Each structure stands twice: as structure tokens, then as C-alpha cells.
Amino acid sequence: MSGISPSSSGLLPMPGAPSSSWSAYKARVAALLGHHDTKVVVAFWLFGLINNVLYVIILSAAQDLVGSLPKGVVLLADVVPSFLTKLIAPYFIHRIPYRTRILIFIALSAAGMLMVALTPATQSVAIKLVGVILASISAGGGELSFLGLTHFYGPMSLAGWGSGTGAAGLVGAGLYVMFTDWWGLSVRSSLLISACFPAIMFLSFFVILPLGPLREGTRKDYDAIPDLEDEDVNHMDQGTASSALLAPGPSVASTAYSARNNQESLTVRDRMNKVKKLFVPYMMPLLLVYVAEYTINQGVAPTLLFPLEESPFDEFRAFYPFYGFLYQLGVFISRSSTPWIRIHHLYLPSMLQIANLVLLTLHAMYFFLPSVYVVFIIVFWEGLLGGGVYVNCFAEIMENVPAEDREFSLGATTVSDSGGISIAGLLSIVMETKLCNYQVAHGRDWCQRISAQGQ
């Protein structure tokens, strides 16, 4: 039995122990919340949550925004601008300070959600889609910026970001179901509430996140200081390097910014060559898993309907948001798992996701799965696979890519998820229509009984 006391170990005292008291608990929790590492994890968790939650809410609201139009239309408006942002921005965004980027992202996302919420149902869907596009640009720029920022804060920041993005899916889909189905709020009211969320990003960056590593970037001299020589960094194994970044002190921050300073001198051709090296090990499996899962979500899921008397729902429009909730629950669990479970072979879960797409497409056509609850399990499994590939892809980059290339690589690889979703959006527009027509032709007209909810 160790003789280390709770107070010296940082653990909370056991209830009933002599050292336990309400004041002791409060003091210990306050110390934990004030710790540098805790602030980093909380800040990046909130970055991931807020940057992605509006995207999820928009997709959850797709059926109510466009009614009988293919949901892939909303998916494309929600993803293509983000994809183009991620495709172009890595070559110049390093010139924009992180503080300025945060303010831009907040303004774009809030304006986009207000435009979607305040556009009357009687007006053109195109106006709503413009608002979706603004939010998409913000999300794309935010993702590549925050993932690049994890380079300076280490593995725990990536764990916080991954868990936050997973929580965004769960919170976004869950909130929309709660607002519209449980509380009976209109779509407009639900989206207006959502437009307030970007303010949390401001608090996360300017209040919670320790800005010491960023302030180091204002120095003109980025040479590593004597207690951490360049030679030491170059010969340090990746696991040790990652651990050293766990709680970046001045020397680690200086080294990180030295690498960034070297990267800023690279030409566009140099950066494109670096992207080519990322494609097969990291970008391709991420692309494949996103093509498969978002084709399921937007092209197949709207047609995965059952007779209402055999389901827990009162109307057909309730299937789609609940599928989204289960999917996002799986994503949240798997994106929060990297401290305990690591996936090094990224192609295996990608292939399993493609198998899910084939299975659910066949069921949409031939209706052979015995219960909607079986579909619930498959959709949850789909979320586990998708979230696992996402967070483990960036964890592999953080471990295996040299420090001088890491910030750029983390940001550049984000183009794969948006690229995959864009491809899925195009496929979904065709697949949803074809599957619905096939079902109607074979005596199942449930997909035609869904209309947009009044705002």
C-alpha cells in the first residue's frame, strides 16, 4: 500500500477519511480545474463541440428545411464550402493570427445560422442554403485551424478536440430532437437558440485556453532555447516528443514555433509534395469512411422506414433525426476513446463502413431486416467506425509525422473528410430519390409521406 497521501497525489480524499471534508473537495476540484492541462483539454473540447455542433444541427434539420427535396442538397451546401476552404486555406491561413481567425469564425457561423432561422418558410430554399454556406466556411476554417493548433498543445489537446467533435454530433442531434420533438419548439426557434452557440468559442479561446504558447510566437527569434537543443528534438522518438508536448513549456513552444517558421518559407509546390505523402496512409482511409457513412446518413437513412405500429415513433419524420442521434452517439464514444484504444490500421474500419453502406442499401430496397431496432444497432456501429477513423487518423499523424511537418499535415488532412462528404452528397441526391421511387413502386410509400415541418 502506497504511503502517498491524497493531498500530495492530487487524488480526492475517500469519503469518510480523516482528510475528507467539503472544503477539501472544493479546494482539490478548484486546483484540478485551474491546472494547465485541464484548461487545454477543456478549451479544445469546447472548440470541437462548437465548431461542429451547428453543422450537425443543420443536417439534423435537413428534412425540415427542404422537405421532399433530397437531403443531399443540404449536405452539399453544408460541406462543399468547407471542403474548398480546407483545400485552399492551408497555403495561406498561417499568415492570419489565431485570434483574428476566431473572431471571423464566430461572425460567419452566427450570421449563417441567423439567416437560416429567420428566412420564412414561404421564401426560396436558396436563401437558407446561403446561410448554411456561411456556417460551412466557418466550420472548415475552424477545423483546420484548431487541428493545426493541437501541434502546440500536444496529445491531450487532440484528445479534447476529438471528444468535443464527437460530443458535437451527440449534442447537435440530441438538441434538435429535444427542441422539436420533446419540447415542441418550431424549427425557427430551435435554430435561433443554436445561433448563440458560437459565443462559447470566444470564451474558450480568450478565457479558458492558456495562451502562453501563442504569445511565444510573437518573439522575433524562434531558435530553440539551450535546455532543448535542435539535435535533442531530432533524435527524440515520436512517443517522447508527443509526451513532451503534453504540457508545453517555453522551450517546447519555442521549438514548435521554430518548426512553423521553417514551414512558412515553403513554396506551394513544396506543400503539395507534402500532401502527396499524406494521401495513402492518412487521407485515403479518411476519405473512404466519410464517403460511406455520409452516403448512409443522407442518401439511405431517409428511406430506412418501418410501419409506425412496429416502431417507437408517431410519425415518419421522426425516424431520420433519431438515426442521426444514434450515429452521433457512436461517433462521440469512439472519438473520445484514444486515451484507451488506438487503431493503427485505418483501412480496416473504412472497409467495414463500406459494408454497412451495402447492407443498409440492400435493406432499403428489399426490406429484409426484421426490426427497426436492428437498424438502430447498425447505425450506432456506423458512428463508432466513422469516429474511430477520424480521431485515430490525426493521432497517427501526431505520432508519425516529423515535428516540422506536423502542423501543416494536421490541417491539410482535414480536406479528406469534407471531400468524402462532398462525394457522398452527390451520391445521396441520386440514391435517396432512386431508393424512394423503388420503395413506392413496390408498395412502400412511407418516404413520400414526409413533409417539411412548419416553421
Curated annotation (Swiss-Prot):
Keywords: Amino-acid transport, Membrane, Transmembrane, Transmembrane helix, Transport, Vacuole
Organism this protein belongs to: Gibberella zeae (strain ATCC MYA-4620 / CBS 123657 / FGSC 9075 / NRRL 31084 / PH-1) (Wheat head blight fungus)
Function of the protein: Involved in vacuolar transport and vacuole pH homeostasis. Also required for cytokinesis.
Gene Ontology biological process terms in this record: amino acid transport; regulation of intracellular pH
Bilayer topology annotation: Multi-pass membrane protein
The protein's name in its UniProt record: Protein BTN1
Gene3D superfamilies assigned to the protein according to its UniProt record, in alphabetical order: MFS general substrate transporter like domains
Family: Belongs to the battenin family.
TM ranges: 40-60, 73-93, 102-122, 129-149, 159-179, 191-211, 286-306, 313-333, 346-366, 367-387
Subcellular location: Vacuole membrane
Entry GO terms, CC: vacuolar membrane
Pfam families: CLN3
